[in-house]
Amino acid sequence: MKLPLLLALLFGAVSALHLRSETSTFETPLGAKTLPEDEETPEQEMEETPCRELEEEEEWGSGSEDASKKDGAVESISVPDMVDKNLTCPEEEDTVKVVGIPGCQTCRYLLVRSLQTFSQAWFTCRRCYRGNLVSIHNFNINYRIQCSVSALNQGQVWIGGRITGSGRCRRFQWVDGSRWNFAYWAAHQPWSRGGHCVALCTRGGHWRRAHCLRRLPFICSY
């Protein structure tokens, strides 16, 4: 009885060894084709981090998608490609110098009362005054500009802020490339329905998102 038992045990051991060998041979090619998770992570983080940071900083309202459809083309094309190169510079009587900016002796701002789209206004500031649409970085400058436009028969004026990017990677930028470190939004802004460009309200000085194809007065810095 011992001999059949020994033969059965020996046969079982050989079968188990053979099965293990076949399993190892089958798994090896599959493992070679599959990248380890820790090798995928760095590249994924580099691609996803900017969007993730923006998701934490900004949440957008339900109207933002409609706004992107309406004037998204304005955001993706540079100013020289968008406007009429024959656009004439404003007459002197249509401009007002903004003076008395506290704490900034070299700051020069100009209110242009002629009505233009955001892109036209941006181009006019660059071409006619060798400047840019104004960027605002503190309350004092915002207040002084608001005082200079309060007498206008218009509810808003263009400043140099706009939305760039798409989806959850959208963010606000100044067209002159300076840092976005100050904002003075009106109630429920910037999350409520609006456009991709930023306008300053002539009463109160608060900011609102506006559709870029609207024609408004504007402020140049030069």
Swiss-Prot record:
Q: Where is the C-type lectin domain?
A: 104-222
Q: Which InterPro entries match?
A: C-type_lectin-like, C-type_lectin-like/link_sf, C-type_lectin/snaclec_domain, C-type_lectin_CS, CTDL_fold, EMBP_CTLD, Eosinophil_major_basic
Instruction: Fetch the Gene3D superfamilies from UniProt.
Output: Mannose-Binding Protein A, subunit A
- SS bond list: 125-220, 197-212
Segments of this protein annotated with the region Disordered: 25-75
After translation, the protein is modified as follows: Nitrated.
| Biological-process GO terms, alphabetical | defense response to bacterium; defense response to nematode; immune response; negative regulation of interleukin-10 production; negative regulation of macrophage cytokine production; positive regulation of interleukin-4 production
Which terms are listed as keywords in the entry?
A: Antibiotic, Antimicrobial, Cytoplasmic vesicle, Disulfide bond, Glycoprotein, Heparin-binding, Immunity, Lectin, Nitration, Proteoglycan, Secreted, Signal
Glycan-carrying positions: 23-25, 34, 62, 86
GO MF, one annotated term? extracellular matrix structural constituent conferring compression resistance
Signal sequence region: 1-16
Query: Which miscellaneous remark does the UniProt record hold?
Result: Binds heparin. Does not bind calcium.
Q: What is this protein called?
A: Bone marrow proteoglycan
